[in-house]
């Protein structure tokens, strides 16, 4: 049986209390997964009072491993299908003594095999957004804040999760006709320029 984020963080809290307390949380991934874990990072950087948080790309984490990585750190490492360098990042964190939470698409991935704790998330065309990688990275952040610092906005945050799927469904319904009209209007254009930016 898989554990809930609340249960996972409860076990981590017991370990950290014995080790001297949580000092740092690393969010590690690459590509779209790195963008997806940004909400958890941003939450902790903004709200945590007694520990800090940073992000690394998977390969950077493996080849320029932070010196403070040890048994008082948590590494939240995300990859849908277990990108090789991200699996290596989990192994690197394990070897340093950190607690690893492998966020991945299923219990059969390489990530699930090497993570100390595993959080699977919804993905694909029928994705449940309240259980997506973004939502779970944020959920881990809220749970760390609650259990380590008794975060005052925790209950409001948990209530908000019940609204996410309805909001997304309504948004899709409103935007679909606009998107279809745009696609029909510009379908024969010879060139498209796509501009994008990362989360930070």
Explain the meaning of each model-derived region:
Residues 182, 186-200:
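Acidic catalytic cores of enzymes that act on phosphate-bearing nucleotides/polynucleotides
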Residues 140, 176, 193-194:
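Structured N-terminal alpha/beta-domain signature
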Residues 3-21, 170-188:
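A short, well-structured juxtamembrane/interface segment
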Residues 1-2, 31, 35, 169, ...:
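Generic low-polarity alpha-helical segments
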Residues 2-7, 52-55, 77-80, 167-174:
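Short, flexible loop segments at the rims of nucleotide/cofactor-binding pockets, characterized by
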Residues 144-184:
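Internal, active-site/partner-interface "lid" segment
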Residues 20-161, 197:
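Glycine-rich phosphate-binding loops that contact phosphosugars or nucleotide phosphates
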